[in-house]
């Protein structure tokens, strides 16, 4: 059975976040067809990267999860001191690296694990192209990386360090056609490079409708509705 490692900055059933949910859904769907291991941090908060969960190996819904500590919490003031400069000038390579460390999660033990165990895995599914773990892993195993960039048209996407790394991955899984166009244009990639994959959904089995909702739906029939889809954290 082929072995696949997922790289994600946070992971867990208690964590809300688009990339985090996507990673967990995909890892759980592939478990059984592949031997899946998730490499992540001990953080639950993406603002501070504070170590909350225990380091080491655990299992969640049958998926092996290996957690590594962040060795520094994020200093938002120091981070924005550098980040805000992106809007005014091109940062040097050294300042970009410093920005990535300050953005975090700064987890060199995770990177060292990939370096020393790279041969143990057939593929690496790497999430979110602007975080430290992703950008450190790609140079080590780029030819086996399936990148899920979860890219937005934001200033971080225009860091020069990305120009060297994104073209080195094996392929890219996009969440939408718009994201595909954004990334392909930004990095001058061939239109055939990467696929729009999105996030799979499993239909619930044997779910009985809530009688209260049936009554409400009947009462509101023909009434214009506004639906909000998002997350609360």
Q: PLM features: what roles do these ranges have?
A:
Residues 5, 201, 213-233:
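Conserved donor-binding/catalytic core segment of Leloir-type glycosyltransferases
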Residues 99-113, 121-141, 154:
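An aromatic- and histidine-rich active-site surface loop
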Residues 41-119:
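A conserved catalytic-core segment of Leloir-type glycosyltransferases
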Residues 152-153, 178-179, 196-207:
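Short beta-strand->alpha-helix junction loop in the catalytic core
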Residues 115-116, 133-134, 139-140, 150-174, ...:
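Membrane-proximal helix-turn-helix segments that form the acceptor-binding/catalytic region
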Residues 1-69, 119:
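N-terminal subdomain of nucleotide-sugar transferases
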Residues 7-10, 148, 175, 197-200, ...:
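Short hydrophobic "strand-cap" motifs at the C-terminus of beta-strands
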């Amino acid at each position: 059975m082929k072995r696949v490692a997922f790289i994600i900055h946070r992971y867990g059933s208690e964590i809300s976040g688009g990339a985090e949910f996507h990673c967990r859904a995909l890892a759980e769907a592939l478990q059984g067809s592949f031997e899946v291991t998730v490499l992540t941090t001990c953080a639950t908060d993406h603002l501070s990267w504070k170590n909350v969960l225990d380091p080491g190996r655990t299992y969640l819904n049958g998926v092996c999860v290996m957690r590594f500590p962040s060795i520094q919490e994020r200093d938002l003031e120091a981070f924005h001191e550098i980040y805000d400069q992106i809007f005014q000038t091109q940062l040097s390579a050294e300042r970009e690296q410093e920005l990535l460390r300050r953005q975090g999660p700064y987890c060199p033990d995770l990177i060292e694990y990939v370096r020393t165990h790279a041969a143990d895995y057939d593929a690496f599914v790497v999430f979110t192209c602007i975080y430290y773990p992703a950008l450190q892993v790609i140079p080590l195993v780029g030819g086996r990386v399936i990148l899920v960039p979860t890219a937005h048209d934001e200033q971080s996407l225009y860091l020069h360090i990305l120009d060297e790394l994104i073209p080195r991955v094996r392929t890219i899984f996009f969440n939408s056609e718009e994201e595909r166009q954004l990334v392909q244009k930004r990095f001058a990639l061939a239109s055939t490079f990467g696929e729009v994959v999105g996030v799979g959904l499993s239909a619930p089995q044997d779910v009985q409708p809530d009688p209260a909702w049936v009554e409400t739906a009947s009462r509101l029939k023909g009434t214009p509705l506004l639906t909000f889809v998002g997350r609360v954290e």
